[in-house]
A protein has these predicted regions:
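Short hydrophobic segments within beta-strands
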Residues: 16, 95-97, 160
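Alpha/beta-hydrolase fold nucleophile elbow
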Residues: 13, 155-158
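Short glycine/serine/threonine-biased micro-segments
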Residues: 43, 115, 119, 160-162
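Positively charged, proline/Ser/Thr-rich regional signature most characteristic
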Residues: 1-8, 79-154
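Thiolate-centered catalytic microenvironments shared by cysteine-dependent enzyme domains
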Residues: 1-90, 106, 162-176
Length: 176
């Protein structure tokens, strides 16, 4: 699909979400996982773009297909064993991006069969706390938001959630 999108080696990529900042960090994370360094997120997504009065185009965009060489970034992914180890190590932090209710097991899960609650030892930082008016909070506020949740941004962090979308928001904020 990247070839048809004309995304290739050396491309600079800007991703955005139609409703603000929600799934764009997951796309950003996917590109970073496969070695793309020049990938960015349009903060606030399409709504912010429109509010700023920027041009909008309609219709299909035709581009020349390009070659992409994936370079897997193992450090961007934690498997089950990695997470178990992280939970057992005192210097590691596993941070769950789901709502407080889902984390505590008092709120419903959106997907059938997904158990409530959280991994023992995990910390909770609902992803919405990192947003303000549909955009990521200012850089100087990011560390404060993490700190208020009992998370030390100076120590290693593994982010998690129910599907990988909201965990990517936390990861993006940590990289911002």
């Amino acid at each position: 699909a990247r070839r048809e999108l004309a995304i290739g080696d050396g491309s600079t990529i800007v991703v955005y979400h139609g409703l603000g900042l929600f799934s764009a960090p997951r796309v950003w994370w996917m590109f970073r996982t496969f070695g793309v360094r020049e990938v960015y997120i349009l903060d606030g997504g399409m709504p912010a773009w429109k509010v700023e009065g920027r041009p909008i185009d309609f219709g299909e965009v035709r581009r020349t297909p390009r070659h992409f060489t994936p370079r897997f970034n193992r450090g961007a992914v934690a498997d089950v064993e990695d997470v178990k180890k992280a939970l057992a190590l005192p210097d590691m932090q596993v941070v769950d991006a789901r709502s407080k209710e889902r984390f505590e097991g008092t709120g419903p899960e959106p997907r059938p069969g997904l158990p409530s609650g959280h991994m023992p030892g995990a910390l909770n930082l609902p992803w919405e706390r990192l947003l303000q008016d549909g955009k990521l909070v200012p850089p100087e506020a990011i560390e404060k938001v993490f700190s208020q949740a009992g998370i030390d941004v100076g120590r290693p962090i593994v982010t998690t959630c129910g599907s990988g979308v909201s965990a990517a928001i936390l990861w993006f904020a940590l990289e911002a």
